């Protein structure tokens, strides 16, 4: 492959979920320096849930988005700084503040059926000189053709790149292949495509490779897979695989390997890996950032995290419905108490 892959690191945004949004500015700077030295193309910086994500619903960050962005902007020399915005959480004013702090790429994220709510934010990003990227979360919940039509809307608003986003880590290689082909068939030739994979079924690397085979231009990944659920496609692993395939990625593999093991992995207060709980996310098709919230609810109410996650999947809950996790836990408690009571009555008969 002759074309240069665009390597988009998400350690300082999606990776924030893995440590409950507690990066210090010093840690953000150190990670950014390592990534910049390794020559990634962009570094995404924000609360895990995007600009203004710090809240009771999603969890408060150790710093504000602007503090993190300024910290990274003060040290990077090569990579562009990206940030993420979810309409309804962040506003155009937040985009302006991020731009003033040093961000130059606005990744506007919506649920995969709601691209129409991105119009104001994509148009504003272009107006102030930012690159605008459309980010269709939970892409497994739409058919390939319907998803491509949502991407077409984002393109019409001014997005120059549109992403297939496997937020639940629920897709396999055929799912990715079908969606990338639909994008290529529907979008203009000059509109780039991207893949954002999660590793809940251990397919983050495989899915990213398949996406590139189908013409994908940009690949999201993170050091040590740092991200929600079982994490994102591990950046250093993807680069090693890409190198073995002879692809032009333009990064320094060994610097990335060192950064993953020496800087990022020691920050994890819960291992970012495929285990019982994160596997349940992928199997049930649940938004990966629900993991820590579900674990907290399970501990509080004496439930199994897997039971909560599977029920969330059955109800088709999506990003932004974190407040419903407690409701699901209470419903499961009620069902447990009813079953216990019914069993007790049966014993008396």
Swiss-Prot record:
What Gene Ontology terms for biological process does this UniProt record contain?
A: catabolic process; L-leucine biosynthetic process
Family assignment from sequence similarity = Belongs to the 4-hydroxy-2-oxovalerate aldolase family.
Chain ranges of the Pyruvate carboxyltransferase domain:
5-257
Residue numbers marked as site, Transition state stabilizer: 13
What's its catalytic activity? Answer: (S)-4-hydroxy-2-oxopentanoate = acetaldehyde + pyruvate
Alphabetical UniProt keywords: Aromatic hydrocarbons catabolism, Lyase, Manganese, Metal-binding
Q: Recorded E.C. number(s)? A: 4.1.3.39
Tell me which SUPFAM superfamilies the record gives: Aldolase, post-HMGL domain-like
Return the InterPro entries for the record: 2-IPM_HCS-like, 4OH_2_O-val_aldolase, Aldolase_TIM, DmpG_comm, DRE_TIM_HOA, PYR_CT
Q: Does the keyword Metal-binding apply?
A: yes
| PROSITE patterns for this protein | PYR_CT
Q: In the UniProt entry, which residues are flagged as the active site?
A: 17 (proton acceptor)
Which Pfam families did the record assign? DmpG_comm, HMGL-like
Q: What residues does Mn(2+) bind to?
A: 14, 196, 198
Task: From the Swiss-Prot or TrEMBL record, give the protein name.
Answer: 4-hydroxy-2-oxovalerate aldolase 1
Residue positions annotated to bind substrate are: 13-14, 167, 196, 287
Q: Which GO terms describe its molecular function?
A: 2-isopropylmalate synthase activity; 4-hydroxy-2-oxovalerate aldolase activity; manganese ion binding
Natural source organism: Paraburkholderia phymatum (strain DSM 17167 / CIP 108236 / LMG 21445 / STM815) (Burkholderia phymatum)
CDD domains this protein is in?
A: DRE_TIM_HOA (cd07943)
